A protein has these predicted regions:
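DPxDG-like acidic metal-binding loop motif
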Residues: 71-102
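Fold-independent oxyanion-binding glycine-rich loops
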Residues: 10-13, 52-53, 74-75, 82, ...
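Single conserved hydrophobic/aromatic residue that forms the stacking wall/gate
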Residues: 174, 178-188
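Stable alpha-helical structural segments in soluble proteins, enriched in small hydrophobic residues
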Residues: 56-60, 95, 113
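N-terminal beta-alpha supersecondary unit
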Residues: 2-74
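Short amphipathic alpha-helical face segments that pack within enzyme cores
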Residues: 48-52, 87, 91, 108
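Short, glycine/acidic-enriched loop or turn micro-motifs at the edges of active sites
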Residues: 14, 130, 182
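Surface "functional belts" at beta-alpha junctions
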Residues: 25-32, 38, 44, 99-177
Length: 188
């Protein structure tokens, strides 16, 4: 019987280190969650990441050699935090002979919403500091998550206005569709 294979995922793009471990289920093309931890690590990702990964693996009873995939959050986020995660993931994947996958931290939020049953339009916005944000819009339907734009940095006020304008436009389109599909009723 083949040894169980696992995927290790982590993200240090923000002030919280997120680490997850999943069992790979090739038959179902799925990853089954095994364990996860989030740790507040303000400017301490470099000293906390590997310690916390080792603890999670130990608690789950998983050996490093069972890791077939390393998945890393590639931001957007803290310049140093993203580089710590990327370098750690690349080194671990290379040392273990495991696959390496980079994932947008914003896409993870959208996929989590989708997996929780959210459908329709979704905006994910992350703080970029200095009154700027990383906004990305998505369409979530039964087929999955569809990213509608590339990563970018804009002033928070600009992103907020864009979202208000989009919501107003969607409301206007919906109103127009309703009006054109129903008879006009007048009271004289």
């Amino acid at each position: 019987m083949p040894e169980t294979a696992y995927a290790l995922a982590f993200d240090t793009a923000n002030e919280v280190i997120s680490i997850g471990l999943g069992r790979l289920n090739a038959a179902a093309c799925a990853v089954e969650p095994v364990a996860a931890v989030e740790v507040a690590a303000h400017r301490a990702s470099n000293t906390q990441l590997l310690v916390r990964v080792d603890a999670l693996l130990r608690e789950a009873g998983v050996e490093r050699g069972q890791l077939a995939c390393v998945c890393v959050g590639r931001g957007p986020g803290s310049f140093t935090g993203v580089r710590i995660a990327m370098a750690t993931a690349k080194g671990a994947a290379q040392a273990l002979g495991a696959a390496l996958v980079g994932v947008s931290s914003l896409d993870v939020v959208a996929w989590h919403a989708w997996a929780s049953g959210v459908r329709g339009r979704l905006a994910v916005v992350a703080d970029a500091m200095r009154k700027e944000v990383y906004p990305v819009r998505y369409a979530l339907d039964d087929a999955g998550v569809h990213r509608l734009e590339a990563d970018r940095v804009v002033k928070a006020q600009v992103a907020a206005q864009e979202l208000v304008d989009e919501a107003s436009s969607a409301t206007d389109r919906k109103s127009t569709r309703l009006n054109s599909s129903h008879q006009k009723i007048s009271y004289a």
